[in-house]
């Protein structure tokens, strides 16, 4: 699932099928796809996510049926397929929150050594609860977006004052992102069983860290300017 646009179009929803994108707004106009409240003509999937898990599952089943070999809708669907080489991809969601979890044992130990010089140290609560912090939702961008080298305060261990400088230790981590597609009610916990039905999908993402800026800004409240 994604959002795409050709030069003459506004961004709207589509589904990648091999080397093509199925234009969902066009498929609706052709009469082969329902879901009038899904907002496929919009530049995000948020309207569709609000339909809930049952609609998500039904839509996926409908897609599989429509795209099966010798589908009766083949003649109507063919004009709705756009070559991937002809489109630009856009951020598929309006993201209000981005929580970054600290869930890899090896990564946690490596960062501990980087920041504190202690090899293999895990925080005492690490094995007992998911550790996370509010990251920068405003810095989420699609693949291929140019990344500027960050500027910030950097303090070397052997000097008293920080300097303003370009980052020299820009790090990135391949991560798995889970998209929460359902709203929660403040003050009401979500069970493990309920949580599974609230996940709309998964994405791969790169978490960028300006390590030399982060080591100075990290204490005592955690990363801020140094993360994207």
Protein language model features and the residues they cover:
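General structural signal for secondary-structure boundaries
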Residues: 23, 40-55, 83, 182, ...
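Glycine-enriched loop-and-adjacent helix/strand subsegments that border the catalytic/binding cleft
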Residues: 90-228
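Non-catalytic accessory segments adjacent to catalytic cores
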Residues: 53-99, 103
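Gly/serine-rich nucleotide phosphate-binding loop at the start of the catalytic core
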Residues: 2-72
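Glycine-centered structural positions embedded in regular secondary structure
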Residues: 2, 12-15, 81, 201, ...
